Structure formats: structure tokens, C-alpha cells
């Protein structure tokens, strides 16, 4: 039996598709025997024209997220090691704006979780829908590699999310 001692990939209520507060995550992690808990809620993106994503926290929620995680890190420092991160896609068109915005906060790590080709508002394909088109798989890999090449990401999360169902040749 292997016991997981660390989890660096967690999402809270702020991303709008997960449940639970940060405190609930910490308490469950301690109960489950985790030694390290990394928060990596879905990062906001500074999309134009007031576009509001339904799958990530809003820009105005970042400060509350950071303050909450840092307070829990201090409160539970004898019980569990807590880290502050974000899961974010690599959208080249908006990347510099995002990094500039996030640089005001003490994030320890970013997880690359690429959910769309192109970007969320001009998406070519949402990765969870699957495809048999090999050119989309190549674009997905190229976009992930470009994100990794920024040097900002700790790791690539769920690369299988793309759901390529085409010829494996």
C-alpha cells in the first residue's frame, strides 16, 4: 500500500467547478496523512472586454486566495507544509499580462494545465472534448512545450486531458 504524502494539485470553490474552502482542504489533508499540500486553484486571466471565464477564479479574487492560503500556512505550520500556487494555461496572447499581474503576489509555483488550444476566448478546441485530428494533437503538444519553455511552470498537469482518439501511428 502506497500512501500519498504530497498533493500540489488542488482547486477550491473559487474556480467554480470544485467544492470546499481552503481550510477544509487543509483539515482533510491532515486527516489523510498528507505532509505537504499545495494549493493550485485555476488562475484568472486578464481577458479583454470583461470576459468572465466560468472555470477559473476572477482577477478580483486573487488577493483573497493568497491571503487565505498564507494565513492557513502560518496557522497550520506545525501540522502540514502548505504551498501557494496556481494552475494556469499557457495562452501566448495574454501571457505577459498574466505574469505581470501575478508578480505582485508571492506564488511559489505554477502548474501548466492546458485546457484549450489557442486560448479560452478564441479556442480552437477544448481539450476535454476529444478529437481524432492529429494536427490538433500536434498543436496541443507545441503549445504545452512553449509554455514549459517559459521556465515558469513546475510541471505539466493531466496531459492526457486532450483525449486524442485518432490513429496512434
What is each of the regions a protein language model found here?
Residues 1-92, 155, 162-169:
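An N-terminally biased module of ancient metal coordination in phosphate/nucleic-acid-related enzymes
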Residues 16, 104-107, 111-169:
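Domain-core and long-helix interface of multi-subunit machines
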Residues 21-35, 93-107, 139-152:
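Short amphipathic alpha-helices and their capping/turn segments at secondary-structure boundaries
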Residues 50, 97, 123-124:
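Short aromatic-enriched loop/helix-cap "lid" or pocket-rim segments at secondary-structure transitions
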Residues 55-57, 100, 128-129:
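Short, hinge-like loop/turn segments at secondary-structure boundaries
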Residues 61-65, 69, 95-103, 136-141, ...:
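Charged, low-complexity, helix-prone segments enriched in Lys/Glu/Asp/Gln
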